[in-house]
């Protein structure tokens, strides 16, 4: 008996699969950038040819995909399209910046200056963005420092969007996008600097569920919780022979 032919994959599913594969490839490139900016620059110089080729491919991808991603953003946003757009923007910026700093190091040989530039030690903190939302009744100002600040700002915009000029909302959302590129553009795991200890995580909830509550509710105990699960150093046991092997 002949086997049934495989079911045809719908066009949206096929497009989603291609975007996921592309997202994984760009994420791998970004991971390489994050490693090279923290490594001995001599290692980066040894991989300069491959790095330039990857940077060129990111340029091509950004040029081809950006119009389509912008068109989709104007019609219907999805988490996948937003993540890919932010990741491509971050990969393009940081890849070009790293190449420039490697070229400078090849000329000067200054290791300290290389790390100062690649780690952004001489630049303002990218995780502090001043947001100004123009409304017909006055201006709303706030500073984005954490990811939940973005959520709070979008809630405010949703509340007062009828009194906000389109141009003012667009300008404010551009600043939000810049913050998101710096915050989550490097990957789905955000930097520890973006963790607010006053906001408990899922691990905090699990711990409070198995400890004595002394009559207090979970909500009350979560409100008094200081979370350090994101910023505390993980305890990892490594064997010296394993390090030599890999």
UniProtKB/Swiss-Prot annotation:
Xref: InterPro entries: UL28/UL56 (IPR000501)
UniProt keywords, alphabetically: Late protein, Viral genome packaging, Viral release from host cell
UniProt keyword Hydrolase present: no
Domain of life from the UniProt record: Viruses
Gene Ontology BP annotations: viral DNA genome packaging
Pfam families for this protein: PRTP
UniProt feature coiled coil, ranges: none
Family: Belongs to the herpesviridae PRTP family.
Function in brief: This protein may affect translocation of the virus glycoproteins to membranes. It is involved in capsid maturation.
Name by which UniProt lists this protein: Processing and transport protein
Species, as recorded: Human herpesvirus 2
Classification lineage: Viruses, Duplodnaviria, Heunggongvirae, Peploviricota, Herviviricetes
């Amino acid at each position: 008996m002949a086997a049934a032919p495989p079911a045809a994959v719908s066009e949206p599913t096929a497009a989603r699969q291609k975007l996921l594969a592309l997202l994984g490839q760009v994420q791998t490139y970004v991971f390489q950038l994050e490693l090279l900016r923290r490594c001995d620059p001599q290692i980066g110089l040894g991989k300069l040819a491959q790095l330039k080729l990857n940077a060129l491919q990111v340029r091509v991808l950004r040029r081809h995909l950006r119009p389509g991603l912008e068109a989709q953003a104007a019609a219907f946003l999805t988490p996948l399209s937003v993540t890919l757009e932010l990741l491509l923007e971050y990969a393009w910026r940081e890849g070009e910046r790293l190449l420039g700093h490697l070229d400078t190091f090849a000329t000067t040989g200054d290791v300290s200056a290389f790390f100062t530039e690649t780690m952004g030690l001489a630049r303002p903190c990218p995780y502090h963005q001043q947001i100004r939302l123009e409304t017909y009744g006055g201006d709303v100002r706030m500073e984005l420092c954490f990811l939940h600040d973005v959520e709070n700002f979008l809630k405010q915009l949703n509340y007062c969007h009828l009194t906000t000029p389109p141009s003012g909302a667009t300008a404010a959302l551009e600043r939000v996008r810049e913050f998101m590129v710096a915050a989550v553009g490097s990957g789905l795991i955000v930097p520890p600097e973006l963790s607010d200890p006053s906001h408990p995580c899922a691990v905090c909830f699990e711990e409070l569920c198995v400890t004595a509550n002394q009559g207090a509710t979970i909500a009350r105990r979560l409100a008094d919780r200081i979370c350090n699960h994101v910023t505390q150093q993980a305890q990892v046991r490594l064997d010296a022979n394993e390090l030599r092997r890999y």
